[in-house]
């Protein structure tokens, strides 16, 4: 059982990426300025109340996951919130893991990086190792290159899970395909450099934002990509 925590606004998406496939829709706000976010105190109280209730009912979570409709590391109090979560986890369900789903762009901030290194599972996005594909697929609102993202991910020294979404089709009249030989070759080289504990490979499963004709990648193709990762000695997980 996973207990999800959303640090973004309830009624809008807060993210510095605007991924063309995002199930949360298009990004309306790319920074936290002027946005009302749950306070560290509110998150602490809500999490403690939920964990206490689960303890009373004998329902233990396997993992406490920071995800939601946006990028959790954009919350200005994420280091303290993670510290609070670890304390509460240890108090109520010490066997549960804490996970963060992130696009890794905030890893260059020392306090954020140190906070993420404390959690059990960092599940971090890398949809491509090519600059142009990142620009089209992820549409970051800052100038960030594939090399910068890869260097960010290398800072975890293998203590992370890479999550990659593969898709094909068209978006705003442009061909979309991050499964070409060129894409896979560059991506595999990046995976080898990062040397993660695991790679999660998946494709779209829900409706995507308007403006595109995006297609799922067949399971057989995903499994083939996974087999190439396995040859690097890295564990893989395929879904979709």
Where is each model-derived feature located?
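Short, acidic Gly/Pro/Ser/Thr-rich loop/turn segments
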Residues: 10-12, 29, 131, 169
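Short strand-loop junctions, especially beta-strand C-caps/beta-turns
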Residues: 6-8, 67-69, 165-167, 204
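Binuclear metal-ion centers of metallo-dependent hydrolases, dominated by the metallo-beta-lactamase
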Residues: 217-240
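Conserved Radical SAM active-site core
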Residues: 21-118
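Conserved AdoMet/S-adenosylmethionine-binding subsite of the radical SAM
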Residues: 74-216
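N-terminal pre-triad scaffold of radical SAM enzymes
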Residues: 1-25, 63-65
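Short, conserved loop/turn and helix-capping segments at secondary-structure boundaries
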Residues: 37, 143, 215-219, 223
């Amino acid at each position: 059982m996973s207990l999800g925590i959303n640090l973004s606004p309830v009624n809008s998406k807060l993210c510095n990426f605007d991924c063309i496939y995002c199930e949360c829709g298009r990004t309306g706000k790319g920074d936290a300025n002027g946005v009302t976010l749950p306070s560290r105190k509110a998150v602490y109280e809500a999490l403690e109340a939920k964990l206490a209730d689960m303890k009373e009912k004998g329902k233990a979570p396997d993992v406490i996951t920071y995800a939601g409709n946006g990028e959790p590391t954009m919350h200005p109090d994420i280091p303290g919130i993670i510290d609070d979560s670890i304390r509460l986890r240890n108090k109520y369900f010490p066997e549960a893991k804490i996970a963060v789903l992130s696009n890794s762009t905030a890893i260059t901030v020392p306090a954020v990086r140190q906070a993420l290194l404390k959690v059990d599972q960092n599940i971090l996005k890398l949809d491509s190792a090519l600059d142009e594909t990142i620009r089209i697929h992820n549409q970051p609102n800052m100038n960030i290159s594939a090399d910068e993202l890869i260097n960010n991910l290398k800072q975890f020294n293998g203590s992370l899970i890479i999550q990659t979404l593969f898709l094909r089709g068209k978006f705003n009249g442009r061909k979309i395909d991050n499964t070409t030989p060129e894409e896979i070759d560059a991506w595999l080289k990046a995976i080898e450099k990062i040397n993660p504990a695991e790679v999660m490979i998946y494709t779209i499963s829900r409706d995507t934002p308007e403006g595109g004709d995006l297609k799922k990648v067949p399971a057989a193709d995903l499994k083939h990509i996974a087999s190439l990762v396995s040859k690097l000695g890295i564990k893989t997980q395929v879904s979709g």
